Regions:
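Function-dense linear segments that define catalytic or interfacial modules
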Residues: 1-87, 234-333, 555, 559
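Flexible, glycine/charged-enriched surface loops at secondary-structure junctions
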Residues: 59-61, 101-114, 123-135, 302-317, ...
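Catalytic alpha/beta core of large soluble enzyme barrels
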Residues: 235-238, 244-308, 318, 370, ...
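Secondary-structure capping and boundary motifs in well-ordered enzyme cores
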Residues: 38, 83-86, 111, 259-268, ...
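Catalytic or ion-translocation cores adjacent to nucleophile or general acid/base/metal-coordination motifs
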Residues: 62-95, 381-413
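Alpha/propeptide regions of enzymes that mature by internal proteolysis
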Residues: 34, 39-50, 85-122, 223, ...
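Short acidic, low-complexity intrinsically disordered linear motifs used
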Residues: 545-560
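Internal maturation/activation junctions in enzymes
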Residues: 128-166, 199-222, 303-313, 321, ...
C-alpha cells in the first residue's frame, strides 16, 4: 500500500524481528478471491496470500477479472494501467517461496527480504511510481550480506550472440550450494568474466533485489574494530558497494530508504528542501530555513492515514517529524555561513507554527536528503554530493510509448538508446559543472569531512529528541586506493553519521549508471545535439508517463 501510494519504505529483516513471524502452515483448503482494481485491492491480495500461510490456511484462488486491461488510462496517478500480469507474477513468486517451506518452518531473513522486493517489483512494473526500499539486516547474517554479490557460474549452453550480447543458459552456486539454472542475456564484458573466471552478477538471477538498498545494522555500543573491518572487506569486494552501513544507538530504530530520517516503527516524516546554491547572506539562509520549517509543520498536521493501522497515526503525531534538507551545497563555500544558526531558526519556527496548528513540536527537524530529483529541477548539485565531474552525462529513463521517445528517436537518435535490462529507453543528457564547483574528483576525506561538518552544524542543532539524530544522506565514491582510508575515517568518526552507502569510483558494476564521466569534446558533441531539441514539437494527446525508476540512491541520485 505504501509503495503504491508513492512512498519509500524502510524495513528490518534483522533476525530478532523475523523470528517473531509465525511458522509457515500449508493451506488445507482453497477459496476464490476477486482482486479489486485499486491500490487497496492490490495490497489486500498480498495480505490474503500471506494470511493463508500464517493464519487461516485458506489458499486464495485469485480472480483478476476486475483489474483494468493493460494500457487503460490511470486518471489519478497518471500513465497507463499495467494490467494484471505484474501482480500475478508477484503473487506467484511469493507463493513459490512459501510453498518451498515445510509445514512448521519459519521464513529466513533473506526469504522475507525477497518477498518485499517482489512486492516492490510489482509496484515498479505497475508504473505507479518507482519503488524505493531500504532493508536493514543483522550484522551476523551471511546470507543477507552476500545476496548482492557475485555468484559462481557455469555456462551450460551458448544459445546465440548479437552485437556483443550473448544469450546463455547458466547455472549458479553460492558457497557450493546450487541456486538455479536460468537463460540470460549478458554483455561481452560479463560474458568474458563468466567464461574465464566463473563469476556472474546477482542481478541476472534476482533482479527484484535491485529494488532495495541493503544495509548492515551496526550497534555503536557493541561493534568491535575487527568485526567492522571484516564487514568492510565484503563491501569492498562486492563490486557494487553494497551493502551499506547503518550505525545506530538502538537496533529497534530504522530509517527511510535514503537514510536521512531517523524513524521509529510505523512513522512518517514531512520533508522540505532549501536551495543553498544561490544563498546571498546569513539572513537569506535563515529566512529559507524558517519557510521550509513552516511548510513542513503544516504538513505534519495531515495524519489521516486511511487503510493503515492506528499505530501509524499515533506514532507519527507523537513526534511530528520534519526533514528540512539542504541542496546545492557543492556550489558554495560552507564556511561563510552559520548553519547552526539557521537550524535554530527552523526549530523556533516549528515550535511557533506547531502551537498555532495544534500539533506537537518536532523531535527531529534538520537533515540532508540525496536530492536527486530536486537538483535536476533547480539545476544544482545533489544534496551533500559534489557535482559528478566537470563534464558528465545524466541518464534519464523513459517509456517507448512516450511522445518524447518518438520525437528524439526521429530527430536526435544520437542521445537515446534501448535499456539493457528493460523494455524502455535511456536518454543521455550532457552536463557541465559551474566554475569553481566541488566535483567528485575531490579527495574522499574532503567529502566525508563535509558530511561531518553538516552533521555537527545543521543536523545536530535541529535534534530535539530521540536516540538517533537525522542524517546526512550520502553515497561515497571510492577510488581503488582509498578503501583503507575510508575504513579508518568511518571507524574514527562513527558518531558523525548514521547511514552511508558506497560505490566504486568507476560506477561499480551498474550498467547505464545515472551518471558517467565524459570528456570536454564529448560534452561539446552531445551539446550540439541537445541544442537541436525543440520541445514545442513534442505533442502528448494522452498520458503515457513511465514512472519506472533507477536503482534507488545510486551514486548520490536517489530518485524519490
Amino acid at each position: 500500500f505504501l509503495l503504491l501510494s508513492g512512498c519509500g519504505v524502510g524495513y528490518s529483516v534483522q533476525r530478532h524481528h523475523v523470528d517473531k513471524l509465525p511458522e509457515v502452515r500449508k493451506p488445507i483448503k482453497s477459496r476464490r478471491y476477486l482482486i479489486q482494481d485499486s491500490i487497496e485491492g492490490w495490497a489486500d491480495s498480498i495480505k490474503v496470500l500471506l494470511k493463508a500461510y500464517f493464519a487461516d490456511r485458506s489458499l486464495p484462488l485469485f480472480d483478476y477479472r476486475s483489474i483494468r486491461e493493460k494500457g487503460a488510462r490511470l486518471i489519478i496517478s497518471g500513465g497507463k494501467a499495467p494490467g494484471a500480469e505484474p501482480l500475478k507474477r508477484c503473487l506467484n513468486k511469493i507463493q513459490t517461496i512459501l510453498d518451498s517451506k515445510g509445514d512448521g518452518d519459519k521464513l529466513t531473513p533473506l526469504e522475507s527480504h525477497d518477498i518485499l522486493c517482489l512486492i516492490a517489483d510489482a509496484v515498479l512494473a505497475g508504473g505507479i511510481r518507482r519503488s524505493a526500499l531500504i532493508s536493514l539486516f543483522s550484522i551476523a547474517d551471511d546470507e543477507m550480506m552476500k545476496c548482492k554479490t557475485l555468484y559462481d557460474g557455469v555456462i551450460e549452453d551458448h544459445l546465440g550472440e548479437h552485437d556483443g550480447v550473448h544469450n546463455v543458459r547458466v547455472s549458479v552456486w553460492r558457497d557450493e550450494k546450487y541456486c538455479m539454472t536460468k537463460e540470460i542475456f549478458v554483455p561481452q564484458s560479463d560474458y568474458d568474466e563468466l567464461k574465464e573466471n566463473g563469476k556472474i552478477q546477482w542481478f541476472y538471477f534476482y533482479p527484484e533485489r535491485a529494488r532495495s538498498n541493503n544495509s548492515i545494522v551496526i550497534a555503536r555500543p557493541l561493534i568491535t574494530k575487527d568485526l567492522f573491518e571484516t564487514k568492510w572487506d565484503v563491501i569492498k569486494t562486492s563490486g557494487s558497494g553494497e551493502p551499506g552501513l547503518y550505525f545506530t544507538n538502538n537496533i529497534e530504530l530504522g530509517s527511510n530508504p535514503c537514510c536521512e530520517i531517523s524513524l521509529n516503527p510505523y512513522q512518517f516524516c514531512n520533508l522540505t528542501s532549501i536551495n543553498v546554491s544561490d544563498v546571498e547572506s546569513q539572513e537569506d539562509l535563515n529566512d529559507r530555513a524558517q519557510v521550509a520549517a513552516f511548510m513542513g509543520t503544516l504538513q505534519a498536521s495531515y495524519t489521516d492515514f486511511h487503510y493503515l493501522r492506528p499505530q501509524w497515526k499515533k506514532q507519527t503525531e507523537k513526534e511530528a517529524l520534519l526533514g528540512v534538507s539542504l541542496t546545492g551545497i557543492a556550489s558554495i563555500d560552507e564556511s561563510k555561513f552559520d548553519f547552526a544558526e539557521a537550524a535554530q531558526c527552523a526549530v523556533e519556527e516549528n515550535e511557533k507554527v506547531a502551537k498555532l496548528v495544534g500539533v506537537n513540536p518536532a523531535k527531529r527537524i534538520t537533515c540532508i536528503k540525496p536530492e536527486g530529483t530536486g537538483s535536476l529541477v533547480l539545476g544544482t548539485s545533489s544534496g551533500i554530493h559534489a557535482w559528478h565531474n566537470e563534464y558528465y552525462v545524466r541518464r534519464l529513463r523513459v517509456g517507448k510509448n512516450e511522445a518524447i521517445y518518438k520525437y528524439l528517436l526521429d530527430t536526435i537518435p544520437e542521445i537515446i538508446e534501448d535499456e539493457v535490462f528493460g523494455d524502455g529507453a535511456v536518454i543521455t543528457i550532457p552536463v557541465k559543472a559551474p566554475l569553481n564547483a566541488k566535483t567528485r574528483t575531490e579527495d574522499v576525506e574532503q567529502f566525508l569531512n563535509r558530511v561531518k561538518f553538516f552533521t555537527n552544524s545543521w543536523v545536530a542543532n535541529g535534534h530535539q529528541g530521540g536516540m538517533n539524530t537525522h542524517n546526512v544522506s550520502a553515497t561515497v565514491s571510492i577510488k581503488a586506493d582509498e578503501w583503507g582510508r575510508v575504513s579508518t575515517w568511518l571507524w574514527d568518526n562513527q558518531d558523525s553519521f548514521n547511514g552511508l552507502s558506497f560505490l566504486p569510483y568507476d560506477t561499480g558494476t551498474y550498467v547505464q549508471a545515472p551518471f558517467e564521466d565524459i570528456t570536454e569534446s564529448d560534452y561539446q558533441k552531445f551539446s550540439s545535439h541537445i541544442g537541436n531539441i525543440n520541445l514545442e514539437d513534442v505533442f502528448e494527446d494522452q498520458d503515457n508517463t513511465n514512472l519506472q525508476g533507477e536503482l534507488a540512491c545510486s551514486g548520490g541520485a536517489c530518485e524519490i
